[in-house]
Amino acid sequence: NTILIVVVGTLSSTIMTAIGAYVMSRKPFPFQKAMMLMMIFTMYFSGGMIPDYILRNNWLHLGNNRLVLILPALVSTYNLIVMRTGFAAIPDSLEESARIDGASEFTILMRIIIPVALPCMAVIILFYAVSYWNSWFEASIYLTDRKKYPLQVILREILIVNSTTEMQVGESGNAQAIGESIKYATIMVATVPILLIYPFLQKYFVKGIMVGAVKG
């Protein structure tokens, strides 16, 4: 479940973020600033837990569906702004030469913008992967079928059961040792997969952060 959510969510979010960032980074269009302000507004203010639950469960009918963990978080405003800044740093002359050769907007995005901004894309992919991998709160609320639980929810349940067992057994040395071992094991299980991915993206990470943070 976790691998499926991370892979599908990361790919979908990266594609949608790249499309949105490309549109927002090109020549100004009507209501562009208003749209950007609306996106930034969502970074600081949310509708709250109850309206969010009603939206996902009653209106979108995503209750007990893995898509409930992907669709509402499909595009991160912060990642969109970072990628938009990275795309905006690419010279317009590259696009103009491609348009002269008859390239469409989609071709320009896939053949020119994304390859040039690959370091920035790698950073965004890592951000989304870590976000989906660590997500557990939404799953604990919207998923009722244990077969659909991601790894983080299972690890959380293990820690809760372990804490309850420690309280029942008492503060004996063996109980504490077992409890600490379980905690360290869950930390390793939750952390190692991301640590294995990072070395492959490390060469892009610093460069991508700089491209996305500084224009020009």
Please place each PLM-identified region on the residue numbering.
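A hydrophobic, multi-pass inner-membrane permease signature
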Residues: 1-216
